[in-house]
Amino acid sequence: EWAKRVVAGAYDSKTPEERRAAIEDNPYSYFGVTRSASDAPPGTYPTDAELLAAGAATLSRILDAEAFVPTGRPAFYAYRISFAGHDQTGVVGALHLDGFDDGRVLTHENVRPDRAEMLGRHLEVVGATSSPISLTLLADPTRKEILDRTTAAVPELDHEVERVRHRVWTVAEADTDAVAARLNANPVFVTDGHHRSAAALAGRARHPDDPTFARTLAVVFPHDEVRVEAFHRRAPDRDRRPVDALVTALATTGTVTEVDDADGAHPRERGQVGVYAHGRWFLLELDPQERQDALTSLDVERLRRDVIGHVLGVDELDTDSD
């Protein structure tokens, strides 16, 4: 019952009007916790401090209603996401931020300081993160056996929002130490949440003696289950070339094939990039690399460097660029 009232879905998947309606109709919607200026009623212009205070008040209302049930002990949670026929099951817990310092947590993206600062203020004033940092690590048979055993039971939470099914189980106390040991066996890689990570680190720097700022919420998925959906970029062509000249420039990075529609441009293999330009769809297959390492071989890095940077002339990591 509470899941239907509290769980709000992805913030960016809703328009400001939809989020505003959810906040007005449901005082327990988590959109009320993460509200921004665009969610305010028309004609009102709340300050950042007022928005954060309203978010903190909404969270207090949810907690006072006992919508969240504490486990009563340190615990991990098994978390399964199901979407479009794909399941992935991970472990939710508190990630110690020292891992960013000693190389146990690896990142691959720059962050925009203004957004990290905004999330940092939210963390300090509201006192909660809206969603976990998503991590991946090498699959492990021992950890999988524990999760398989845990998820064989009826889930404690089973909720669907926006066609995504979420299920949660509490890992048994007897398995907690074994799960912790397996999670610490290898480095983890941030797949989503670089700004949330930066915000958490900034909070720790401002509150070095507060243990609540020494860790942050995270979920870890095994590498053989994790699926990363498309993250589209809208980038200008600095040279403003006609489509044929642009295709010629793209061809310096790989093979370009014009396709009929967006489905034809959807990447289905590693090294493929869908391109929409001048009302036409193309599939770009990046040339093989002579030398590869863990970072430069990532499709997202090759797209940033070879296509957005080299061809379009846009530095995606420039925090001052639009």
How would you describe each model-predicted region?
Residues 1-322:
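Surface-exposed, charge/polar-rich loops and edge strands
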